[in-house]
Amino acid sequence: GYDWLYDSLQPDTRRVVREAIIAKGFDAAKNTRHAWFYTAKNNWNSVCNSGLAYGALALFEEIPEVSKGIIEKCMETNPKAMVGYGPDGGYPEGFGYWGYGTSFQVMLIAALESAFGTDNGLSQAPGFMESARFMQYMTAPGGDCFCFSDSPVEAECNMMMFWFAGKAKDLSLLWIERQYLDRP
């Protein structure tokens, strides 16, 4: 929201937010004790890289070289997380963590496409787009999910499915989401 609200923020508020993004995001990611997520092949990679990329995009006009470095590191390391979707869209962390980790992956891809006109092929990683169909297959007729890993039984609407449907131009990806939205 920093860049969206920039013109409405007081200068002191801008400074506090900018310094927090740098200290709690960029600087922390330089510390090897905290930066293990760069080599992770799971949702931690997507979640952390997404947050850093959003911070870099928000501060790009103010600190372009630092922001560029953050985005380049993201593009270098985020493909490791994409391996989990291959080869055919099955996801190793179950229904719940697909929703969590993939939501950050989708936000990252959408932000890169919005800012730069490309996601540098992230959405084309083997199995990534197919994983939306995997989520439909993970849903039982009664509306709960087949759970494994540490996923709960309760299924819920995954808002990123709307992104997948738009990207794939396939509204059939939304049929189960409608059922979730129609629940009392």
Language model: regions and residue ranges:
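Active-site lining segments of carbohydrate-active enzymes
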Residues: 1-96, 107
